[in-house]
Amino acid sequence: MAAKEIKFGRTAREKMLHGVDILADAVKVTLGPKGRNVIIDKSFGAPRITKDGVSVAKEIELEDKFENMGAQMVREVASKTNDIAGDGTTTATVLAQAIVREGNKAVAAGMNPMDLKRGIDLAVAEVVKDLQAKAKKISTSEEVAQVGTISANGDTQVGKDIAEAMQKVGNEGVITVEEAKTAETELEVVEGMQFDRGYLSPYFVTNPEKMVADLEDAYVLLHEKKLSNLQAMLPVLEAVVQTGKPLVIIAEDVEGEALATLVVNKLRGGLKIAAVKAPGFGDRRKAMLEDIAILTGGTVISEDLGIKLETVTLDMLGRAKKISITKENTTIVDGAGQKSDIEGRVAQIKAQIEETSSDYDREKLQERLAKLAGGVAVIRVGGSTEIEVKERKDRIDDALNATRAAVQEGIVPGGGTALLRSSTKITVKGVNDDQEAGINIVRRALQSLVRQIATNAGDEASIIVGKILDKDNDNYGYNAQTGEFGDMIAMGIVDPVKVVRTALQNAASVASLLITTEAMIAELPKKDSAGGGMPDMGGMGGMGGMM
């Protein structure tokens, strides 16, 4: 085991605070509408330019191990806030730095760190209640666009794209952000359920120009096993032919004789048909087949349920107004499933999302939820250079997450105004002077956002804070973009409650841990042993006889 270096008390906290300051100072320059960019060197390729707090935080690694510990703790604040709310990473970093700085001063003055922590916790709980009480629910597309615009640093087009996407696919729908191949940013919406499996044979195509199989008002047969021959299916195939409607078979696989027979019948024109592999694997495949069954009002043909292919009747098949199948994807639009059944399935998947601890499972469940609940929208981010595209993609990701958070918990006045106002509403009292000091630490820290936004805009922070607090209106704040004071919500400058709340709670949590730290342990740096050079050759004097 390597030897360790240990630092105690004030020395430890000062080292840690220095690390916190280095990371926070690099991140906080990005805050607000006039925040600056940070350029990050890459080991290969062009450097990356970003205004995304968490991207900056993730790149910082300090040489001094004790300083690095402080920096990494604050990095954790940014990452955790990003994971939960999807935005607010810079906010969380600024708050954490402010609480740690003030807390460190209090500990150095001889106050009890544990009482300071209790005071901080009391104040944060009261601020969270105040934020939730002030929250304004958002409903219109304009309000959604406002949130997106603010989070994308004033890019109105981003706000509009996100609002349009959410309008088309619903609040639960999946919206993905991809890099475009062109200079323009565009929005593409896929309505209905789409999964990543295409036709099993190109002979099923109905539109040879586009290589797409479009089947209108089709029946859907869902089978969880492989289909190798069609003998067992003949009764149901004949019943479908009688109706004159097309049929889409979704099964684990359709192979050999079964596939050949279907293709021959399709080419002869007797049967409008297409076959597709079922999406997913294992248990997830079963669940997704069940989702498709509920969406189309059909039944999954499964031995587990005691249903055999021979006994399948027309009413066990699903129905859909339109099914489009390309080489890679299948899209089911307007399934005939009962609304109540779909809502029940959505509620069931939501419950599974709450319970799961795996990020991968959660992501897959959210995809399934979106496919049932609305559809999928893709925002393709364009730009003149690769660096510009990456920077815009960062901003759109943030804006999208902020917008989702706003829909969930509502909005409050932006620009740090909500927290600044909350600092005057803290009425809770500590049981002793040290707890009271902890409450005051939070009061002062809540001003740090407005101060930093003003500083980044080149304004005098103290004057801005004073002017805002002079007015008794909760919505009154400072628009750093235009340099005007006024009603923040009317000006469209808003923050999602979830983002502000998460940032404050995470910042206070980690800052409290740093304040109550009394010892730090790190590995001693390894001493490099002297290099193993060539042995001494005695001045090479022994070579004289070689001449």
From Swiss-Prot:
Repeat as UniProt keyword: no
Residues annotated for ATP binding in this entry: 30-33, 51, 87-91, 415, 495
GO annotations of cellular component type: cytoplasm
E.C. numbers: 5.6.1.7
GO molecular function annotations of the record: ATP binding; ATP-dependent protein folding chaperone; isomerase activity; unfolded protein binding
Family annotation (InterPro entries): Chaperonin_Cpn60_CS, Cpn60/GroEL, Cpn60/GroEL/TCP-1, GroEL-like_apical_dom_sf, GROEL-like_equatorial_sf, TCP-1-like_intermed_sf
A biological process term (GO) from this entry: protein refolding
Transmembrane segments: none
Family: Belongs to the chaperonin (HSP60) family.
Complex formation: Forms a cylinder of 14 subunits composed of two heptameric rings stacked back-to-back. Interacts with the co-chaperonin GroES.
PANTHER family from the UniProt entry: 60 KDA HEAT SHOCK PROTEIN, MITOCHONDRIAL
Record's function text: Together with its co-chaperonin GroES, plays an essential role in assisting protein folding. The GroEL-GroES system forms a nano-cage that allows encapsulation of the non-native substrate proteins and provides a physical environment optimized to promote and accelerate protein folding.
Name assigned to this protein: Chaperonin GroEL
Source organism of the structure: Allorhizobium ampelinum (strain ATCC BAA-846 / DSM 112012 / S4)
Gene: groEL
